[in-house]
């Protein structure tokens, strides 16, 4: 089977790696163009780009697939199927119709729940008890195509964005191979649009004094490693935390261990990171902190 693989971030790496070891032929890899990164602003290739080059596979980095020249190039690869995993570009109808078996997508949620760009974060923020992977046929809608295969698992207490991301990436690659091995036997199941909800891209990682304690706790897990508080205009990331039901004045740092009183409970930071420093335990962090900072309100 001739496959075009379309993906960019680390989530897609497991799937590409498995395809490269399979009997199928990956004829081209489509990924986002390198972006300037770091202090030197050197172009940084996506994880998928790096693996494709190491495997001597042609890499394509179009800025859009809406142009006829790009569509003709795609057609000339003569794909039987296109596999999409967090690619980052919209696939127009002309592209969707080229492969014999269409374009199939690896989506890290139990569709139709959490269609959109940030399903893992929203799964955690909502307090969902389970999650999973949906292998779906792409159409012109937003993650609205029929489902080819779906598998779920329970979310564990200690799961955060990273652990769920890694579990879903592994499950997605395994499920993808099952679908491809039975591609002619698949019976697509139409999604129930009435059950759909959407996972918009997350851009605000701050924990606010007005947040309920459970919301703040979920933010720590959902936004790992980016959730933060601000004290005296300093940004402090909270990488791990717990919480308890006891609470006092909302938004206040209630003791020298930086326990944060919020609505409905107290957030208990366990691992934190000050801007420009390495992560450390809350105990080590407090030892190196000005005493005034642990008597303030978060901003």
Curated annotation (Swiss-Prot):
GO molecular function, one term: methionyl-tRNA formyltransferase activity
Pfam families assigned to the protein according to its UniProt record, in alphabetical order: Formyl_trans_C, Formyl_trans_N
CDD domains in UniProt: FMT_core_Met-tRNA-FMT_N (cd08646)
Keyword Transferase: yes
Tagged with keyword tRNA-binding: no
Catalytic reaction annotation: L-methionyl-tRNA(fMet) + (6R)-10-formyltetrahydrofolate = N-formyl-L-methionyl-tRNA(fMet) + (6S)-5,6,7,8-tetrahydrofolate + H(+)
Residue sites binding (6S)-5,6,7,8-tetrahydrofolate per the record: 109-112
Record's keyword terms, sorted: Protein biosynthesis, Transferase
GO cellular component term, pick one: cytosol
InterPro entries cross-referenced by the UniProt entry: Fmt, Formyl_trans_C, Formyl_transf_N, Formyl_transf_N_sf, Formyl_transferase-like_C_sf, Met-tRNA-FMT_N
EC number(s) from the headed UniProt entry: 2.1.2.9
Similarity section: Belongs to the Fmt family.
Protein function: Attaches a formyl group to the free amino group of methionyl-tRNA(fMet). The formyl group appears to play a dual role in the initiator identity of N-formylmethionyl-tRNA by promoting its recognition by IF2 and preventing the misappropriation of this tRNA by the elongation apparatus.
Protein name: Methionyl-tRNA formyltransferase
Source organism per UniProt: Wolbachia sp. subsp. Drosophila simulans (strain wRi)
């Amino acid at each position: 089977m001739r496959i075009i693989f379309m993906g960019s971030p680390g989530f897609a790496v497991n799937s590409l790696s498995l395809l490269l070891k399979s009997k199928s032929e990956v004829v081209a890899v489509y990924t986002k163009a390198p972006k300037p990164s770091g202090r030197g602003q050197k172009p940084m290739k996506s994880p998928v780009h790096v693996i494709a080059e190491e495997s001597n596979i042609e890499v394509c980095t179009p800025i859009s697939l809406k142009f006829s020249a790009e569509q003709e190039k795609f057609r000339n690869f003569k794909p039987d199927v296109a596999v999409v995993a967090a690619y980052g570009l919209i696939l127009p109808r002309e592209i969707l119709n080229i492969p014999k078996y269409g374009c199939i997508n690896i989506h890290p949620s139990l569709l139709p729940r959490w269609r959109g760009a940030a399903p893992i974060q929203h799964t955690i923020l909502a307090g969902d008890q389970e999650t999973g992977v949906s292998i779906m046929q792409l159409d012109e809608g937003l993650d609205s195509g029929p489902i080819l295969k779906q598998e779920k698992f329970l979310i564990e207490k200690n799961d955060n964005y990273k652990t769920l991301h890694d579990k879903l990436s592994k499950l997605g690659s395994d499920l993808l191979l099952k679908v491809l091995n039975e591609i002619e036997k698949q019976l697509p199941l139409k999604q129930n649009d009435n059950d759909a909800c959407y996972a918009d891209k997350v851009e605000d990682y701050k924990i606010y004094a007005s947040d309920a304690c459970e919301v703040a706790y979920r933010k720590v897990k959902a936004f790992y490693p980016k959730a933060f508080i601000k004290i005296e205009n300093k940004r402090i990331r909270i990488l791990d935390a717990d919480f308890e039901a006891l609470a006092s004045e909302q938004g206040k740092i209630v003791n020298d261990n930086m326990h944060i009183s919020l609505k409905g409970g107290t957030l208990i930071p366990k691992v934190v990171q000050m801007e420009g420093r390495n992560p450390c335990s809350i105990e080590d962090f407090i030892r190196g902190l000005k005493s005034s900072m642990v008597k303030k309100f978060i901003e």
